[in-house]
């Protein structure tokens, strides 16, 4: 059975595809999660995260932009942006402890993103939590 970390990783992949302009990905979310063996409770968890992030994307992106020290949303890599979007959705709309959400985002960024991403993601999420 898949873990929540694996479910989040799948959601990041879906958000990444969505960010690259594949709006049609929303039609295939169920099949993609099934292919990655994300099932039952974890599938419900992943669907909630993906759909919630997409539904609240404008508000999430506003949070990112307003907490950047410099640059714009388009300056952030797609993987890093996907990790941030998911984490910010969880911070704003889910009831998990903020420290767990931030730690999970940092760990996922170590595996999926560029070398400087964990520090950048940690700093930005920390600012958002403290705002």
Curated annotation (Swiss-Prot):
The UniProt record lists the keyword Transcription: yes
Biological processes per GO annotation: DNA-templated transcription termination; transcription antitermination
One of the Pfam families matching this protein, by short name: NusB
Keywords: RNA-binding, Transcription, Transcription antitermination, Transcription regulation
Signal peptide positions on this chain: none
Gene3D superfamilies from the UniProt entry: NusB-like (1.10.940.10)
Superkingdom classification of source: Bacteria
The keyword Membrane belongs to this UniProt entry's keyword annotation: no
One Gene Ontology molecular-function label: RNA binding
InterPro entries the record matches: NusB-like_sf, NusB_fam, NusB_RsmB_TIM44
GO cellular component: cytosol
Function: Involved in transcription antitermination. Required for transcription of ribosomal RNA (rRNA) genes. Binds specifically to the boxA antiterminator sequence of the ribosomal RNA (rrn) operons.
Family in the record: Belongs to the NusB family.
The protein, known as: Transcription antitermination protein NusB
Phylogenetic placement of the source organism: Bacteria, Pseudomonadati, Campylobacterota, Epsilonproteobacteria, Campylobacterales
Name of the gene this protein is made from: nusB
């Amino acid at each position: 059975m898949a873990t929540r970390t694996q479910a989040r990783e799948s959601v990041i992949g879906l958000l990444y595809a969505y960010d690259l302009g594949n709006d049609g990905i929303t039609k295939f979310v169920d099949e993609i999660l099934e292919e990655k063996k994300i099932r039952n409770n974890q599938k419900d968890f992943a669907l909630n995260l993906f759909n919630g992030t997409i539904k609240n994307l404008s508000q999430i992106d506003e949070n990112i932009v307003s907490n950047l020290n410099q640059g714009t949303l388009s300056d952030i890599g797609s993987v890093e942006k996907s990790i941030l979007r998911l984490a910010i959705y969880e911070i704003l709309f889910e009831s998990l402890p903020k420290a767990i959400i931030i730690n999970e985002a940092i760990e996922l960024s170590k595996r999926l993103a560029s070398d400087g991403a964990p520090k950048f993601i940690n700093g930005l999420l920390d600012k958002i939590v403290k705002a």
